[in-house]
């Protein structure tokens, strides 16, 4: 293989790696957002339940 051909293969490998990395990162962001939403909903549910508020005052912004 000539130098030009090796350089072309190198560029293709770098491009493919970048595309895979970028796509994986975007998918990961979506999972993080979904987990964050679930945590928020769980905390809101706790903050509307008096026994849960009593057991976890720090979650709802209240101190003992």
Swiss-Prot record:
KW Secreted (keyword) present: yes
Keywords: Amidation, Disulfide bond, Secreted, Signal, Toxin
Molecular function in Gene Ontology: acetylcholine receptor inhibitor activity; toxin activity
Residue ranges the record assigns to the propeptide: 22-43
Disulfide bonds: 46-52, 47-60
Cysteine amide: residues carrying this PTM: 60
Tissues where the protein occurs: Expressed by the venom duct.
Signal peptide location: 1-21
Subcellular location(s) of the protein: Secreted
Transmembrane segments: none
GO cellular component, one term: extracellular region
Function (record text): May act as a toxin.
Family under the similarity heading: Belongs to the conotoxin A superfamily.
Note on domains (UniProt): The cysteine framework is I (CC-C-C). Alpha4/7 pattern.
General remark: Negative results: does not show activity on alpha-3/beta-2 (CHRNA3/CHRNB2), alpha-7 (CHRNA7), alpha-9/alpha-10 (CHRNA9/CHRNA10), alpha-3/beta-4 (CHRNA3/CHRNB4), alpha-4/beta-2 (CHRNA4/CHRNB2) and alpha-4/beta-4 (CHRNA4/CHRNB4) acetylcholine receptors. Does not show inhibition on high-voltage activated (HVA) calcium channels currents that are mediated by GABA-B receptors.
Record-given protein name: Conotoxin Vc1.3
